[in-house]
A protein has these predicted regions:
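A generic structural signal for short, non-catalytic loop/turn and secondary-structure boundary residues
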Residues: 1, 57-60, 124, 180-182
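Glycine-biased, low-complexity coil/linker segments
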Residues: 3, 8-9, 15-20, 145
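Aromatic-enriched hydrophobic runs in primary sequence
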Residues: 4, 10-11, 65-66, 118, ...
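ADP-ribose/NAD+-binding catalytic cleft of ART/PARP-like enzymes
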Residues: 12-108, 196, 206, 212-215
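Active-site and NAD+-binding cores of ADP-ribose-processing enzymes
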Residues: 21-43, 69, 77, 133-215
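ADP-ribosyltransferase catalytic core
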Residues: 61-62, 97, 101-163
Length: 215
């Protein structure tokens, strides 16, 4: 989907108005759970514009989650352009991204949000939201569920300039999103997305899409 697509639904603004790293409150007011308003938003905006990620979640049998600080029930946001590492070494994060770029990956650590199908992991970072990336997003994942880059590990990729050495260590992929969701690995999402508060809409979405929730 083009980033300049104009949306006419009353809950929307132009997608191009969302700046990198920005989140905009959208949809029903936090003062009350308005089922009718949310169903309008879901059917008219989220379903058609997030069909790729919805299908991946259904095929993977799980939702994608992200934890962040917010009290709003529905948020639309966009990934970062220059995300700062939280738990990883800064220089290694730059090297990691450099290697991903050399291998042709578009979603890297510094320009993405991190999502996971592990609700427990998402809760560690803040309020839990179910994430539906908007069509046209890029993604990358590795076999790791919670990757923190530390110089203490002294792996070969840290000193080698050969992208294949990096590849053999991390085996990054940008296909079969449903597999990544099912396996519960950390996924980098580059693009725009809807975030729906888990404790408000989790049960509704579970019944709507036939996707189970964590026990």
């Amino acid at each position: 989907m083009s980033a300049r697509l104009y949306l006419t639904n009353k809950y929307h603004m132009r997608l191009s108005e969302i700046e990198p790293g920005q989140k905009r409150n959208i949809g029903p007011a936090i003062t009350g759970y308005d089922t009718q308003k949310f169903e309008q938003l879901w059917e008219k905006a989220i379903v058609p514009n997030c069909s790729e990620s919805i299908a991946a979640c259904k095929n993977g049998g799980k939702f994608m989650y992200r934890g962040f600080s917010s009290m709003q029930p529905v948020v639309r946001g966009r990934s970062w352009d220059d995300r700062e590492p939280v738990d990883s070494d800064y220089k290694l994060s730059i090297r990691f991204d450099k290697m991903l770029k050399a291998l042709g990956f578009k979603a890297i650590r510094s320009n993405s949000i991190f999502v996971t199908s592990s609700l427990k992991t998402a809760k560690y970072f803040g309020t839990s939201y179910i994430i539906f990336p908007i069509n046209g997003f890029n993604y990358t994942y590795t076999p790791y569920k919670d990757l923190a880059l530390s110089p203490e590990s002294e792996d070969d990729w840290m000193t080698s300039n050969d992208p294949q050495v990096f590849y053999q260590e991390f085996h990054p992929k940008n296909k079969d999103l449903a597999v990544a969701i099912n396996e519960g690995v950390e996924i980098y999402i580059n693009g725009q997305y809807y975030a729906l508060k888990y404790n408000v809409y989790g049960e509704y979405l579970s019944k709507k899409l036939g996707i189970g929730l964590p026990e």
